[in-house]
From Swiss-Prot:
Belongs to the universal ribosomal protein uL15 family. Coiled coil: none annotated. NCBIfam families: rplO_bact. Residues 21-31, 42-51 have a biased composition (Gly residues). Part of the 50S ribosomal subunit. Keywords: Ribonucleoprotein, Ribosomal protein, RNA-binding, rRNA-binding. This is Large ribosomal subunit protein uL15. It comes from Bacillus mycoides (strain KBAB4). Binds to the 23S rRNA. GO terms for cellular component: cytosolic large ribosomal subunit.
Amino acid sequence: MKLHELKPAEGSRKVRNRVGRGIGSGNGKTAGRGHKGQNARSGGGVRLGFEGGQTPLFRRLPKRGFTNINRKEFTIVNLSTLNRFEDGTEVTPELLLETGVISKLNDGVKILASGAVEKKLTVKAHKFSSSAKEAIEAAGGSVEVI
């Protein structure tokens, strides 16, 4: 094999379609835009959600709900991710942040019971699901709500 014999894998390179370059190309003359009309013009086309003058869906449906300004957003950590820590480790939100398990704290950490924990850990967090609490204690660990 020589350098000049190298070829890209089949289908990995696609030649870009140059429109408006003659009839033979299959995309000449109107360049795939059809004849006249709003969509044939430069800058033409309808805005997002426009339905041709008909009352659009988002206005036909009633308003619903509100945004709770006091909503707390917890960073979720599953039990399966706690297995990366050594036996007997005290797992705190600061440690989770340090080790890169979570990227930011938000309003606190909530431990959920997805997966299983096989190690005896002391877990400190802001919230626990009841099944996560049981699983940690069943593995011989302890739970502390901050």
